[in-house]
Amino acid sequence: MIGENRPHIRPLEAFPAVAQGGQPVVIFRDPLGIFRETLLLNPQTAHLVALMDGSRTIEDLRMGFFRAFGVLPGMGELDQLVADLESKGLLFGQTFDILAGEKV
């Protein structure tokens, strides 16, 4: 995932919420219904996902997160997040194209 990979999140609905235990979360829902579940992320990870507009490399995303929160996420963590979003069809790319084709 290192290099010129520029993750591009699809338009999703996002809602702030409070999880059991009182922790703030952001709930993401796919309005196209390709990913039928909801995705719960902590606000910091949700911020990182919001930066995935297709214009930023993985390293750009890491630096954007660092500027916002003062912590540099590990490459492995970020690669895993991107892989997870991709596998769910939440990023524009090959998996989304396949899943969208199956839905038609």
Predicted regions and their residues:
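Long, low-complexity, charged/polar intrinsically disordered regions in eukaryotic proteins
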Residues: 1-34
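Long, charge-rich, low-complexity alpha-helical segments
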Residues: 32-104
